[in-house]
Amino acid sequence: MKQGKTLETLGAELQRQRAARQDFVADTRHLNFYTEDGKSRLTLTTGNKLLEFGVNPLAHQQISARLGIPLKYYQRMQTEAPALLDENVNNWLQQSPERRMLRVMDGNVRAFLSDRYRRLDNLELCAAVLPIIQGMKGAVIESCEVTEAHLYLKVINRKMKAEVAVNDACVII
């Protein structure tokens, strides 16, 4: 892993993300997918409000998988026939109604998940894991990073490094 953020900058980013995130559980019949200026958009009708979001690459993959549209074909429609993609996605959203959770960050759908998905954010995860890491003798958080899809913590346990020598047989259980 490349050198990433310090724990302090990671904490600040996770706080920012917590304030910027939104989760919506919606019936797929209240969703509309369209392309504008080469960018995919997803609208959600809630009561008398119309919410509009961009769609990030991971959400595209999840939409493709959930609707049973092969990813290569989905991506080809994105670039070569966006109107066809819009029609396909909207057709399957209407024809196969179900409740889905939309995870939104900074105005973009970043995940298209089951409505039963446990809502756990990176800040909660760090709050649970960091005390355990800090309690490990010799453990040092070397680097951390957060992306749209992943949280990375590089932890080096200097005590273990001193006990395990090169060419020692190790078994991971």
Show where each model-derived region lies.
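Intrinsic disorder/low-complexity polar-acidic segments
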Residues: 119-173
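Feature for intrinsically disordered/low-complexity regulatory segments and propeptides
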Residues: 1-128
